[in-house]
Amino acid sequence: MKQQMTKKTFFIAFVVSLGGFLFGFDAGIISGVMSYVGPQFDLNDAQTGWVVSSSSFAAMFAMLVAGRLSDRIGRKKILLAVAFLYALSAITSAYAISYETLFLSRMVGGLAFGAALILAPTYIAEISTAENRGKLVSIQQLNIVLGFFAAFLSNYYFNQFNISGSEAFNDENVWRWMLGVEFFPAILYFGLLFFVPESPRWLYTQNQSDSAKDILKKIHGATQAEVEIQSIEKNIEESEISKAVSIRELFAPALRFIMIVGITLGILQQVT
């Protein structure tokens, strides 16, 4: 019998995937910022490139450690840290007084979205049923696109305020508004995460099975919760067995082509 998606499951997935919205917003907003920041800070081409790409550079390192760190202290704690870093990056970027402070502030945001891109899909997969997992995880991708759209729309309106001659949105200030407005969805994200439970699967790995069962019952109901509990227990057992598998297995003939295709698609997505 097909399991229907509950409103609670959708709400949790939507809240967690707001990190994707902030990623898209952060990545898109910089396109409007640089036409003002460049002349104000007298940036050369290399510095301009670093301001734009610094967040992606920092995200690379966050991706390497976010998964392992969340295994130790929990998915929810890392997601809360992600929301906090987004808010901190927005405020410090808006008040940047030099190339260096803007560069470092952007890197803080990069740490946030690097961790979010790893953890949000993982968390959503861990709280959803097999029937609805694909649909719920895809909310993350939808929110990334919506974030880009919101960023371009925000840039448009701030540019219109600048053109209108408003003193508050002059050339020296308008880019600060562009960057600072991200603080509001970041704080909303932070607040909503307190209504999100810890990952049941992570709780199981920490020998907190009773808490995990309670969460699953609240999300899916008692009947489906039993199915999910069995699935989690089986998955954890299989994970323990697979720990002995070396990373060199990725280069085995059976997986090599799949890995190359996956990496190529990721590179092409970023290049375009």
Predicted regions and their residues:
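Transmembrane-helix signature of 12-pass secondary carriers
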Residues: M1-T272
